[in-house]
Amino acid sequence: MDRVFSVEDISDQFWSPPAREDSSKLVMNRSDSEWAFQSFLQQASALESSQPLPSDPVPVAGDVKNPVEIPANVPVDSEDYQAYLKSRLDLACAAVALTRASSLKPQDSAALLDNGSQASNTSQLVSQVPPKGSGHDLSKEEDKEALAATATPLLPALQKKSAIQVKSTTSGSSRDHSDDDDELEGETETTRNGDPSDAKRVRRMLSNRESARRSRRRKQAHMTELETQVSQLRVENSSLLKRLTDISQRYNDAAVDNRVLKADIETMRAKVKMAEETVKRVTGLNPMFQSMSSEISTIGMQSFSGSPSDTSADTTQDGSKQHFYQPAPTSHMPAQDQKIQNGLLQVPPVDNLQQHSASGPVEGNKMERTSSMQRVASLEHLQKRIRGGVSSCEAQVSGKQ
């Protein structure tokens, strides 16, 4: 608590002038505050003639409990005593400042200098009061009161700075925690009791902490969304892998069936070529066989039509045209014609082939149906070629007649 001295607080007596000391004694050789304050107390005790004052390395802050009566009617030089008090006060302020300078930040030291200036202003107020008494005891008590007035405004400021520094350290170590109500309450109390600069710094700290908390929440929400998308993509990937496995299995089965069908087609082609060669050997012997093959082709076409009327007409035909299938008498025919007739007996008629194919099992294999259709197609091709040869032979016979 700051103490302001007024004119009413000072008694109407003059102070005794202190003895002038050399300037070399006033210079502080060490930077340690304790030694400086000890020298100050020793110099103050040297002014006493009757009772010495023990040295105390700890600065005293507070009111004087045991006041000493001021002797009356002691002449004193007011200007010299004011200069002496001012020098003592500056020395005490410097000692306290050096003590706290090592543990404070630059902004804290600036605040300390402000408090020092306030203390100097207080000392100026004390020095402006005209002294009215003199005495060694009065000078000693006045020095103590001036030192108490100087230390009193300094100590609360230092306590505030240290409390704010401790709070900032605590808040910096607990940034990872999202909610810390106790610290917020402590910082609010510090803001109320501190100066405006500390309040601004605390508000800035709170805003930074709040922004960091919001950013952590946004990151957490973003990570949750990404994890959900990853799980969905994994499910879709597993379903696509199953479909791919199924499709690949079907493709392998289709490839095997394709190879089997190709082998069957090659086999049927070889059989068709062998049948064509056999037909060529038979049809190239005698033109008389071409006329008989024309009848066979007409019968075969009627049987291939598939209508019930055609098949019934084929069954009700007279036997006048069936002499192509019966062997002729061999008495008036040459040996070559007999060989041709014997060869015709070996060729199965188309009707028999159609009946054989129709009498087969209905529930046959797919490959057997394909082979039978290929045989029918090859026979139709042969019949077309035979009909072309028959027409040319008939033209030659009509020309000879």
UniProtKB/Swiss-Prot annotation:
Keywords (alphabetical) are: DNA-binding, Nucleus, Transcription, Transcription regulation
Q: Where is this region: Leucine-zipper?
A: 226-247
- Where does this protein have compositionally biased stretches of type Acidic residues? 179-188
Q: Which Pfam family would be a valid example here?
A: bZIP_C
| Composition-biased stretches (Polar residues) | 115-127, 300-319
**Where are the stretches annotated Basic motif?**
200-219
Q: Where is this region: Disordered?
A: 113-146, 160-199, 300-322, 352-372
Q: Which residues form the bZIP domain?
A: 198-261
Give compartment(s).
Nucleus
Q: Which GO terms describe its molecular function?
A: DNA binding; DNA-binding transcription factor activity
Q: Where is the composition biased (Basic and acidic residues)?
A: 134-146, 189-199
- This protein's major location comes to nucleus
Query: What's the superkingdom here?
Result: Eukaryota
Name the InterPro entries on file: Basic_leucine-zipper_C, bZIP, bZIP_plant_GBF1, bZIP_sf
Q: Name one GO cellular component term.
A: nucleus
Task: Please give the function described in this protein's UniProt entry.
Answer: Binds to the G-box-like motif (5'-ACGTGGC-3') of the chalcone synthase (CHS) gene promoter. G-box and G-box-like motifs are defined in promoters of certain plant genes which are regulated by such diverse stimuli as light-induction or hormone control.
Report quaternary structure and partners: Binds DNA as a dimer.
PANTHER family, sorted: BASIC LEUCINE ZIPPER 63
**Family from the record:** Belongs to the bZIP family.
Stated name of the protein: Light-inducible protein CPRF2
High-level lineage: Eukaryota, Viridiplantae, Streptophyta, Embryophyta, Tracheophyta
